[in-house]
Design a protein with these regions (language model features):
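Metal-associated gating/positioning segment near the N- to mid-region
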Residues: 1-46, 53
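Metal-coordinating catalytic core of metallo-dependent amide/deamination hydrolases
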Residues: 41-185
Length: 185
């Protein structure tokens, strides 16, 4: 399964996999990639000593192949609108707001000299990032860094829309537009 594979990948494996992918993309005419990066921690769920260790593997792959990269570290906190914890097999994906900000800032610093790279924000979804942490992340980056892309999955399936209505009282797009300044960023 996806989780089993994700829990086996080392930083070196990730760099090799991303390098191969990016080279294949370049061969097909792509010059840029937006990488939604979910896996942030060691297989046991503990952070690496360098917060952005796995992000750096992706940045290195982009440097090796020459593809332009927008790295989008994904914030993933809960398994549902009701705040259920992530599953055991998702432990490499989960972050607190503080740890997510560290990963983002460390990755941005790592590629600061690479003008063809950018680090944005990816909030997994309304169901996987509760409203307060979502606001905290958006406000932090609005106040403390240059303009960077912000991405959020609105809903992956109809059931998620139904859960949003039950939990937030609104459809996901409606809630997002009423609670955050959605713009070209």
């Amino acid at each position: 399964t996806m989780y089993r594979f994700a829990n086996l990948v080392s930083p070196e494996d990730l760099q090799a996999i991303a390098s191969y992918l990016y080279l294949e993309m370049i061969k097909q005419g792509y010059t840029s990639v937006a990488e939604f990066h979910y896996v942030h921690h060691q297989p046991n769920g503990q952070p690496y000593s360098c917060a952005s260790q796995l992000s750096q593997s992706i940045i290195n792959a982009a440097n090796i192949t020459g593809i332009n990269l927008t790295l989008l570290p994904v914030l993933y906190m809960t398994a549902g609108f009701d705040g259920q914890p992530l599953l055991e097999e998702q432990k490499r994906f989960g972050n607190s707001v503080a740890r997510y900000i560290d990963i983002h800032n460390d990755a941005a610093q790592y590629c600061a000299d690479e003008s063809q790279h950018n680090v944005g924000i990816a909030l997994h979804s309304l169901r996987a990032v509760p409203t307060e942490p979502m606001s905290e992340v958006i406000n932090h980056f609005a106040n403390n860094s240059s303009v960077c892309p912000i991405h959020v999955h609105i809903a992956e399936q109809t059931r998620e829309v139904e859960h949003a209505i039950a939990s937030l009282g609104k459809r996901p797009v409606e809630w997002l537009l009423e609670n955050h300044a959605v713009d070209k960023q």
